[in-house]
């Protein structure tokens, strides 16, 4: 284990986090607020991480170091990111600050705040900006900024990129990262322009665009997008969250005008089919409730289906009050999640597709024991290592979900609250059901449950293994 390089890279990335605090600091100054919570945080990060970043180390690392670097950076980033909240005095405890920061960077969108609008503008901006930073991944940004990492940077992006397979658009990983971030920035600016053009104030358009881009769910308003009864806003948000839920490699193909290759993506077709089916089912279930016609029911359904499957967690209605069938459909979407190599969370549609094809193959083997059938996606054979990794991931996911739900249930709340809290944090969705639904918050949970959920958020965002590696004795044995 090349520990010197591990700590050096952690230090360099955290200095980037410190630099990102300049934006909320400028917002605080613009609105005449105290900037000292940002200044203190930047100073502390500089004192701790500047010596690490200057540490002499050989840039030699492999998959083991890659997973350790990713796990450490995300844990340390959440800790440092919680300091502006703590220094601002707006939060009751450091555990609450850690919960909010973890929810921000992992793009979960769960909150412990009963009154978001009481926060200073600078803190609100930082809260939503953490979604944007965490959406594409801090290590993907680091790879774009530090091309000196060379070919070995694939170990970092492999550990951080969501999904069973890693997107590589061009031979050099650093150039791939730059392309991805270029697309990410362009789409974010487009969302800001659209929301501003639809009638939102520029500040609100910006902070909500950060949340939409990261498929996070934080808002500057207590009522989320229900506070903006402007024509077209919900359609802009639903369409944008849908786009950010897609594999970013598809946007690269679109820029190259390779549209046939885009439609060949089986994950894309599966994802769109799930969205369409869920929208129709929920609209059919809601029609007798709202009595506003099929179009209004489809509008409500489409917004919340895209919000949940993208793991954004925005809302215009309290779906915790919807019929049980609609709530069950949304819970299933929480499991499914978005596409691989997107900013969304969940299990990912590619894994669901692989699992369905494994099930189909096993059923056929029962009928035809000598049958030899390979699993394919997009016309290519899925490697056995990918199949094994998918099954191990799903097994770990369910075990962590059950363990987290068990710990949260110690607070004495209902099964729906305990289970949906665990699922919402592990899948990075944000809101759960009942008291922790869209119009509620997680302040009622105990510190143990909040820490458990914070750990689940990071574990779910990194897709389990980089966090498990940190607790593996075998990884640290030969340091």
Name each region found by the language model.
Residues 1-479:
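Membrane-proximal intracellular helices of multi-pass ion channels
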């Amino acid at each position: 284990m090349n520990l010197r390089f591990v700590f050096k890279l952690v230090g360099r990335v955290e200095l980037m986090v410190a630099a990102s605090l300049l934006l909320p600091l400028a917002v605080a100054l613009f609105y005449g607020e105290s900037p000292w919570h940002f200044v203190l945080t930047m100073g502390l990060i500089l004192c701790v991480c500047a010596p690490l970043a200057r540490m002499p180390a050989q840039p030699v690392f492999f998959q083991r170091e890659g997973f350790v670097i990713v796990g450490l950076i995300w844990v340390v980033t959440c800790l440092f990111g919680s300091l502006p909240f703590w220094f601002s005095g707006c939060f009751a405890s450091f555990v609450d600050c850690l919960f909010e920061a973890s929810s921000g960077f992992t793009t979960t969108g769960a909150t412990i705040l009963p009154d978001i609008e009481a926060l200073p503008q600078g803190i609100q901006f930082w809260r939503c900006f953490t979604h944007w930073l965490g959406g594409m991944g801090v290590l993907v940004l680091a790879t774009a900024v530090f091309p000196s990492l060379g070919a070995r940077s694939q170990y970092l992006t492999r550990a951080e990129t969501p999904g069973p397979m890693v997107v590589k658009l061009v031979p050099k990983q650093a150039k791939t990262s730059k392309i991805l971030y270029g697309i990410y920035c362009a789409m974010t600016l487009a969302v800001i322009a659209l929301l501003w053009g639809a009638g939102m104030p520029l500040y609100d358009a910006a902070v909500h665009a950060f949340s939409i881009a990261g498929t996070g769910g934080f808002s500057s308003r207590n009522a989320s997008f229900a506070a903006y009864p402007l024509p077209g806003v919900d359609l802009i948000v639903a369409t944008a969250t849908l786009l950010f839920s897609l594999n970013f490699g598809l946007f690269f193909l679109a820029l190259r005008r390779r549209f046939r290759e885009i439609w060949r993506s089986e994950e894309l077709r599966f994802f769109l089919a799930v969205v369409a089916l869920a929208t129709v089912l929920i609209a059919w279930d809601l029609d007798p409730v709202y009595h506003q016609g099929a179009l209004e029911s489809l509008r409500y359904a489409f917004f919340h289906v895209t919000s949940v499957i993208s793991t954004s967690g925005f809302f215009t209605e309290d779906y915790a009050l919807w019929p049980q069938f609609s709530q069950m459909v949304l819970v299933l979407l929480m499991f499914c999640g978005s596409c691989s190599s997107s900013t969304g969370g969940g299990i990912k549609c590619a894994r669901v597709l692989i699992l369905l094809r494994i099930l189909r193959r096993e059923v056929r083997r029962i009928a035809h024991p000598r049958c030899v059938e390979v699993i394919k996606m997009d016309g290519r054979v899925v490697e056995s290592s990918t199949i094994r990794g998918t099954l191990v991931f799903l097994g770990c996911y369910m075990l962590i979900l059950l363990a987290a739900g068990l710990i949260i249930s110690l607070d004495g709340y209902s099964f729906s609250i305990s289970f949906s809290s665990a699922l919402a944090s592990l899948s990075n969705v944000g809101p759960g059901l009942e008291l922790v639904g869209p119009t509620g918050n997680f302040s009622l949970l105990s510190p143990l449950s909040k820490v458990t959920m914070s750990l689940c958020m990071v574990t779910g965002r990194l897709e389990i293994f980089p966090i498990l590696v940190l607790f593996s004795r075998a990884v640290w044995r030969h340091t």
